[in-house]
Amino acid sequence: MIVNKPPMGWNTWNTFMEDIDEEKVKASADALAASGLDKAGYNYLVIDDGWSEKRRDSNGRLVPDKKRFPNGMKSLSDYVHSKGLKFGMYSDVGNWTCALYPGSYQFEYIDAQTFAEWGVDFLKYDYGNKPMGTHGKLLYRRMGAALATCGRDILFSACSWGTDETHEWIKTTGAHMWRSTHDLFNSWESLNDIARSQVALQPYNGQGCFNDMDMLIVGLHDTKLPGDGCNDTEYKTHFALWCVLGSPLM
């Protein structure tokens, strides 16, 4: 799978955080399609952390939260696809995700196969709770290899936080985009700092594997995100900088 331009779409985290469910995802898919943003290339709808049960099933498989996703992920994936969109999900390199749901450490192949069976098109793979003494390069290579053999094209988003000299090895993992920064907070100071930090990393950005400057915060005046927010001019500048620097727009 070759990715020729920075992926674009929408991720649930900055709006809903862990408070996500089937109806909210369907409503978001409806809104993306009705707005025409999909026609402009915003075609990925990605569910972030917090979607699963707290334990795997007896076969070691991830299980969607039964109360919040009563019809399962394949049904939800089919709904998103019916709107002309692509369906994305979240996991983590560790035993646990950042929000303490089951991660994919040592379950990479079974999880990749599960995601393929659910019709997943995009995997955000976070860096929280990384096992001590295990290098990120190995962890991302494991999932990259698992996705390469799962029988489905799944865009691999390595959310590696820009640590551990990721730029030097990320293209050996099969990732199509990689987090080249720490988390973006909802403030002018944070987005300005991140934009400036990316200048030296531009040689690593391009077709096949794009530098991800974190999810957009445009228009998020009233959210639970850290930071005091921005004014509209600052949000517009934020969007322009992400475009100029070739970041995915999610």
What residues fall within each predicted segment?
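Non-catalytic accessory regions flanking glycosidase/transglycosidase catalytic cores in CAZymes
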Residues: 1-41
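Structural recognition of the beta-strand scaffold that forms the well-ordered cores
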Residues: 2, 7-12, 41-48, 86-91, ...
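Second-shell loop/turn segments in exported
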Residues: 12-20, 64-66, 101, 130, ...
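Active-site beta-loop-alpha junctions enriched in small/polar residues
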Residues: 13-15, 50, 92-96, 128-130, ...
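Extracytoplasmic/secreted proteins, especially bacterial periplasmic and envelope-associated proteins
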Residues: 20-27, 31, 71-75, 110, ...
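Aromatic-lined carbohydrate-binding/catalytic grooves of carbohydrate-active enzymes
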Residues: 28-132
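Glycan-recognition surfaces
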Residues: 107-110, 149-250
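Extracytoplasmic, non-cytosolic globular domains
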Residues: 122, 128-154, 161-162
